[in-house]
């Protein structure tokens, strides 16, 4: 049997709910989830799960007059159930190195092809940023890397764009790191982690930009459960 996943799109919240189906036969819980999704949204999409290696996205800007501008590459992580966990920070040449090495000219062709598709579909009806989530996976037939060119399109200023702008505006040249979103359910644990990282990775600036170290992107108290932070090395 091949593992599949069902997706329910929640348009207002700009998110996707995932239901993993390890077997073809649906359980009562599976049926309840799918029925609920159909009642709320009218449709679900089902597709075979891939042997994921890396999540990434291409970020664009549409001016609403038929023009699309490529903003950059976003390399990010996701938990097993699909929840976003963070982005890699760094210069575009660093982020693109894996893709250029493994896909060569095909990566540039993909960038151009996706950009043209975005222009035709959204160029005259949408003004703003949008990201196309993609996936590097291993082909089961030969074990080689392949790319799924469109997992979903997010018509908003994505976390990938946030990471892209942080890399461009606030990181020192050649600095690399991670932007992370974490959750801890135990009271006080997030605060303890924050204090530890602040001491273990002291912030070091160069010419007004982050050279290395830890910086929290939100206030952290003893009641905090979610954290957003940058760790540069």
Model-found features: residue ranges?
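Beta-strand scaffold of nucleotide-dependent catalytic cores
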Residues: 56-78, 83-87, 148-153, 163-165
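A long amphipathic alpha-helix within ATP-dependent nucleotide-binding catalytic cores
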Residues: 29-51, 59, 70, 82-145, ...
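Peripheral (often C-terminal) accessory segments that flank ATP-dependent C-N-forming ligase machineries
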Residues: 171-233
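C-terminal catalytic subdomain
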Residues: 147-181
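Short, flexible loop/turn elements at secondary-structure junctions
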Residues: 48-50, 62-64, 75-77, 134-138, ...
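Glycine-rich phosphate-binding loop of ATP-grasp-fold ATP-dependent ligases
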Residues: 1-31, 57, 80-98
């Amino acid at each position: 049997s091949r593992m599949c996943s069902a997706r329910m799109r929640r348009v207002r919240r700009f998110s996707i709910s995932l239901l993993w189906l390890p077997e073809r036969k649906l359980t009562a819980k599976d049926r309840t989830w799918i029925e609920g999704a159909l009642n709320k949204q009218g449709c679900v999409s089902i597709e075979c799960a891939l042997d994921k290696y890396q999540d990434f996205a291409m970020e664009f800007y549409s001016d609403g007059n038929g023009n699309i501008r490529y903003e950059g590459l976003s390399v990010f992580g996701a938990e097993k159930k699909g929840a976003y966990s963070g982005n890699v920070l760094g210069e575009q040449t660093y982020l693109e190195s894996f893709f250029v090495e493994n896909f060569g000219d095909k990566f540039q062709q993909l960038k151009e092809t996706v950009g043209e598709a975005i222009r035709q579909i959204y160029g005259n009806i949408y003004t703003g940023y949008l990201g196309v989530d993609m996936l590097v996976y291993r082909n089961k037939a030969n074990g080689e890397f392949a790319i799924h060119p469109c997992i979903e399109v997010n018509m908003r200023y994505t976390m990938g764009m946030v990471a892209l702008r942080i890399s461009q505006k606030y990181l020192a040249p050649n600095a690399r790191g991670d932007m992370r979103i974490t959750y801890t359910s135990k009271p006080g644990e997030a605060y303890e982690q924050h204090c530890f990282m602040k001491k273990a990775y002291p912030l070091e600036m160069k010419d007004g930009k982050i050279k290395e170290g830890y910086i929290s992107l939100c206030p952290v108290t003893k009641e905090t459960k979610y954290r957003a932070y940058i760790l540069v090395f």
